[in-house]
Amino acid sequence: EILIGLVGSEMCIRDRIKSVWLTPHIMEDIPNTTAHLRDRFAELQAAYTGGVQLHLAAENMLDNLFEERLGKNDLLPLGENGDHLLVETSYFSPPMGLKNILLRIKSKGYHPVLAHPERYAYMDESDYRQLKDMGVKFQINLPSIAGMYGNRIKKKAMFLMREQAIAYIGTDIHSYSIFQKFICTSVTRNVQKLLDL
């Protein structure tokens, strides 16, 4: 299904997407190991014949497992230099000491990238500005721009786009049917604007 999605992405936004970072979840409920994810990624690379360059990273829930792996530097970072770390929180409440956790990530030499901040019910525009001033980068999800998660989340995503606060764009692909419905249809115009920034 991931392979189909990658082919679909090439068809939908041809010549604009040059590389894709695959970011499986790591959290206490899904305790993927770096070794397991690297093995599965090697299998994917062996099977994929498309023209998009593939990379492996992870989306890390800021929980106790993350704290443990951060301490051991057992991580799968983003970026050509391997110095960006994709992190997420609960949609409804931040972990205790969120800003301190983000500062610890920075102290380890990583740039924290907050996944889908537009979807966090506890965050608003002032929070985004504070985090940006701290050096936190943002990744928004394409379905948010398409309105898949509702108008409030779409407005927050569009605010982040207008502020040019976006470092990465995520597809949030968990199934090909979602990809077809939202990524290849209603999101295209807004994505084009974002890519042209």
Residue spans of the language-model regions?
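Single conserved hydrophobic/aromatic residue that forms the stacking wall/gate
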Residues: E1-G8, I13
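Conserved, mostly hydrophobic/aromatic
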Residues: P24, H116, D172
